[in-house]
Amino acid sequence: MTDPYREFRQAVDRGEEKIDLGRAALTIALTDYPDLDIDAYLARIEQLAVEVTARCDAGGEVYQWLAALNYVLFQQHGFCGNSDDYYDPKNSFLNEVIERATGIPITLSVLYIEVAQRVGLALEGIGFPGHFLVKLSQNGTDIVIDPFHRGEIKSRDDLARMLGRLYGGVVELRDEFLRPVGKKQILKRMLGNLKAIYANSNDLVKLLSVLDQAIILEPGAVDEIRDRGRVYLRLECFAQARSDFEAYLRLAPHATDAQQVREQLVDLAKRVTLIH
């Protein structure tokens, strides 16, 4: 059987430019779908690109290609944002997004980026607050696109209104919100969504798997190391909890919660003494 953590490490343990975003995103799902045929889903992405190419002349303008991309994804195949069950973890697994033709902003954006790349459009992800977007830089102008809403092109006024809806008018649009994010940041955000879902549902085993992947992606992620220690503690895996807490204090000795973690280590030592 495939080792999901080894596969994920192989997918992400390289420079940004060498990461295959589609493959890496699919490997996230291996912990939940151990028999997942990643190459089969990559082939389905390739087929979507073939269908887009068939609808557009090779010399077509960028907006023609975007129109063809939107037609194939959102009209022909019916991809759409899952507003009815937004926090279903399936929305965060790219294989399920492809299978069910629905997802959340970041997974639909990954699919959009990957299909676009295969037809020659170099789209980038945007870590817009509360709602992941993509953009295409064209002749000094950014075309901002919302795959969750069927590939709508967003003006700055649209984006300002979106922030208003998301944050009640307390957050103003800033240029930094439109900066591109790297592939590892996209994967980190995908894992962050799953982390929040499993934490809220108290699914400790799946939460532990996501934290393991997050630490593979970013070995020095101190918050993830601390949080994994807390999950281990709740699972009564005391040696692993102690190891993570000690690593956290080595990496972040002056963190605001460092004293709390030290106290947890003292409590752990007492528990281990009682067990023995």
Pin down the residues of each PLM region:
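A structural boundary/capping signal
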Residues: 1-276
